[in-house]
C-alpha cells in the first residue's frame, strides 16, 4: 500500500506513555501520537531516525503520527493500523497462497466471544476466520511476537481453535513489518502463555503463517512467506 499523506523524518527523543512521544522536528521538540501500544523499545531509542505521517483531524491534539523507525539501516513500520490494510490488499491480489481458494473478504467478523480481522468465504461453503498480528520485534534476524504480554492475543488463538472444531478453517497470520528476517517464533520470554497457546493452536490444525514486508518511507507491501519455528 502507498501512503498518500505527507511523510517527514524526525529524531526520536522520548516516549512518556504508550500514546505519546516527543521528537525533534526541524530543530524543535514536538509531541506526536504513537499508533502502537506495544513497547517498541528496540526501535524507539533516543536519536533514532523516525518517520512521521501528517494528520489533520479536527479533534487531534497532535499534528503527526509516529509510524516507523530505523533500526540501523532497516526501516520498521510500527503503525498498528497498517497490518490489516496490507493483508487485505494481499488477499485481494491473491498473493497469499493459503487463501487463494476464497473469493469473498469480510472485515471484523465475530465468532463466539471474539472478533477476528477477516472472514473469508469461497465456493462449496468454504469459510475461514483469519486473525492478523503485526510484528515489530526483531533480534539477530529473528522476528518475534509479542513485544508485550497480550491476554487478548492468547484468547484469539483459543477462539480460533473453536472455529476449527466447528468445521471451518482458521488461521493466524503474523505480518512482519520489515524485511530480511531469518524466521519467526513466539516471544516466549515475554509471554509464555501466548507461546503455549500458539503451539496448542497449531496442534489443533489452526494455520500459523508469517510474511515479511517491503517497507519504504511511503509504502509497505507484503513480500515473502517466512518460516515459523514453534
UniProtKB/Swiss-Prot annotation:
Which Pfam family, just one, is annotated for this protein? SfsA_N
| GO MF, one annotated term | DNA binding
Q: Which residues form a coiled coil?
A: none
Question: What Gene3D superfamilies does its record include?
Answer: 2.40.50.580, 3.40.1350.60
InterPro entries linked: SfsA, SfsA_C, SfsA_N
**Could you tell me which NCBIfam families the record lists for this protein?**
sfsA
Which family does the entry's similarity section mention?
Belongs to the SfsA family.
- According to UniProt, the name of this protein is Sugar fermentation stimulation protein homolog
Specify the species: Clostridium kluyveri (strain ATCC 8527 / DSM 555 / NBRC 12016 / NCIMB 10680 / K1)
Q: Which gene encodes it?
A: sfsA
